[in-house]
UniProtKB/Swiss-Prot annotation:
Gene: ald
Enzyme's top EC category: oxidoreductase
Pathway: Amino-acid degradation; L-alanine degradation via dehydrogenase pathway; NH(3) and pyruvate from L-alanine: step 1/1
Gene Ontology cellular component terms for the protein in this record: cytoplasm; plasma membrane
Entry similarity comment: Belongs to the AlaDH/PNT family.
A Gene Ontology molecular function term of the record: alanine dehydrogenase activity
CDD domains, per the entry: L-AlaDH (cd05305)
Biological processes per GO annotation: L-alanine catabolic process; sporulation resulting in formation of a cellular spore
Naturally occurring in which organism (per UniProt): Oceanobacillus iheyensis (strain DSM 14371 / CIP 107618 / JCM 11309 / KCTC 3954 / HTE831)
Official protein name in the record: Alanine dehydrogenase
UniProt catalytic activity: L-alanine + NAD(+) + H2O = pyruvate + NH4(+) + NADH + H(+)
Pfam family, one: AlaDh_PNT_C
Subcellular locations according to the entry: Cytoplasm
Known role: Catalyzes the reversible reductive amination of pyruvate to L-alanine. This enzyme is a key factor in the assimilation of L-alanine as an energy source through the tricarboxylic acid cycle during sporulation.
Length: 376
């Protein structure tokens, strides 16, 4: 199989879907890897490194898309890339379709087989989402601390305080991978940290991890409102796999915050956790202000640390890519339940139930989509 890796074109997205090490892995499995020239430069991987690993360097993105049996990316295709979609193409990338109706329609209409990193599930975990969630969580606190500086428009708070001066208050909504790593960095900076989650079992786990160094609260409107009101930094990190993110922090809650406070919405890929966040921002223009509160809603936070993020991502994606390339999409889906859970669109059908529910499509299971195609 020919695996194509185009350069990412989303604003300031410097990650790349394949490292030279990943190229070697796929070539050793008997496949061809074509990389668009310059695709790895943002992550400090030179074209020469890919060539030495055995990849073919391709001059244009169009040729990469046209030649490939499977395209591997980091972020979802943008509208300028929809023209490359075609029946029989496998697309393996982050998709976040519940928040992307136009992309979903393009995938359905073109009959691409779209396998989403973020919904591949193993024993209740999301192994292809985890490394980027770790990066995004750690970055979220760093970013929030930066924008609390007065020069950035913040309220002039040092999260760790100093002797005789109170510490900054950080509230993390969602105690999953993102939230846990955000809390770790906030604690490391010396902040006063609260984690809010809906799952009492998870709250007990967090208490075991952090002990008495953090406060845990059950998620409900009252607790969220009280915590948000007193916070300097609020990080939204609640994700429901494949679905739109819940708007847990209301406009009224945000109006109760002090001017210069900061919100970081890590869930913006799926629509965001804050009612006042109605659009993603970019690394070029990361902040907007509403109710005198700074809103950071960049959808590709790990793109700011591309070397770390790229290596972490490809460590987990390439083994699945080898299976898909070696067996073909249908056989890989049939043989591996994890890959099955990643299939969001196939043969013109929406095959991930949460996406179908959010966007108003009829849900067709991947197994039935395969059968329907075989009957044609």
């Amino acid at each position: 199989m020919i695996i194509g890796v185009p350069k990412e074109i989303k604003n300031n997205e410097n990650r790349v879907a394949m490292t030279p090490a990943g190229v070697v892995h796929l070539i050793n499995a008997g496949h061809t890897v074509q990389i668009e020239k310059g695709a790895g430069l943002g992550s400090n991987f030179a074209d020469a490194e890919y060539k030495e690993a055995g990849a073919e360097l391709i001059d244009s993105a169009a040729s990469v898309w046209e030649n490939a049996d499977m395209i591997m990316k980091v972020k979802e295709p943008l509208s300028s890339e929809y023209k490359y979609f075609r029946k029989g193409l496998i697309l393996f990338t982050y998709l976040h379709l519940a928040a992307a109706p136009e992309l979903t329609k393009a995938l359905v209409d073109s009959e691409v087989t779209a396998i989403a990193y973020e919904t591949i599930t193993v024993n209740g975990t999301l192994p292809l989402l985890t490394p980027m969630s770790e990066v995004a969580g750690r970055m979220a606190t760093q970013i929030g601390a930066q924008y609390l500086e007065k020069s950035e428009g913040g309220k002039g708070i040092l999260l760790g305080g100093i002797p005789g001066v109170s510490r900054g208050k950080v509230t993390v909504i969602g105690g999953g991978v993102v939230g846990t790593h955000a809390a770790k960095i906030a604690l490391g900076l010396g902040a006063e940290v609260t984690i809010i989650d809906l799952n009492p079992v998870r709250l007990r786990q967090l208490d075991d991890i952090f002990g008495s160094s953090i406060q845990t609260l059950m998620s409900n409107p009252y607790n969220i409102a009280e915590a948000v009101k007193d916070s300097d930094l609020v990080i939204g990190s609640v994700l429901i796999p494949g679905r739109k993110a819940p708007k847990l922090v209301t406009d009224e809650m945000i109006q109760s915050m002090q001017p210069g406070s900061v919100l970081v919405d890590v869930a913006i890929d799926q629509g965001g956790n804050f009612e006042t966040v109605d659009h993603p921002t970019t690394h070029d223009e990361p902040i907007y202000v509403k109710h005198d509160v700074l809103h950071y809603a960049v959808a590709n936070i790990p793109g700011a640390v591309p070397r770390t993020a790229t290596v972490g991502l490809t460590n987990v994606t390439v083994p699945y890519a080898v299976q898909i390339a070696s067996k073909g999409a249908v056989k890989a889906i049939q043989d591996n339940p994890a890959i099955l859970t990643g299939v969001n669109v196939m043969n013109g059908k929406v095959t991930y139930e949460a996406v179908a529910a959010d966007l108003g499509y009829d849900f067709v299971s991947p197994e039935d989509a395969i059968k329907d195609a075989e009957l044609v």
